[in-house]
């Protein structure tokens, strides 16, 4: 069984791998843990770059807001919000996307959470209300009942 965070990662990786099949001007960044996930095709050797401001970062989440990344930075962000069963659910329901939003966010659209010196958790930054408003103003897909 997958941990819930791993399932979100799997959905995000699926979208990062699938979108370039239908949009030949972008490719999945081939650099291990490179940022962003999608970069302009042919711009970098072997379509691999550790960090660059060009491209789109992809996230998948079961939450309608409060999305997180690892660093507050200027980035195009695309979030695929989905609905699916959780491990405790007894009655199965089909996986579905409920909304897809994307926008260019600035460092000011993130709130850095950091961590204490004794913490082992991964550092995170959360999309602020200003970032959320940008994302919602530039919606790509909205399923019925999830506006």
Residue map of PLM features:
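Nucleic-acid endonuclease domains
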Residues: 1-35, 39-55, 60-147
């Amino acid at each position: 069984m997958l941990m819930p965070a791993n399932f979100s990662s799997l959905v995000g990786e699926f979208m990062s791998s699938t979108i370039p099949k239908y949009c030949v001007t972008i490719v999945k960044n081939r650099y291990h843990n490179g940022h962003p996930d999608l970069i302009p095709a042919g711009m970098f050797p072997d379509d691999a770059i550790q960090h660059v401001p060009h491209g789109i970062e992809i996230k998948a989440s079961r939450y309608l807001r409060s999305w997180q990344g690892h660093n507050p930075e200027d980035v195009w962000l695309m979030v695929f919000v989905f609905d699916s069963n959780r491990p405790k659910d007894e009655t199965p329901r089909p996986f579905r996307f409920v909304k897809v939003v994307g926008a260019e966010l600035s460092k000011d659209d993130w709130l850095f959470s950091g961590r204490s010196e004794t913490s082992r958790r991964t550092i995170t930054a959360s999309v602020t209300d200003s970032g959320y408003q940008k994302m919602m103003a530039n919606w790509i897909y909205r399923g019925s009942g999830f506006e």
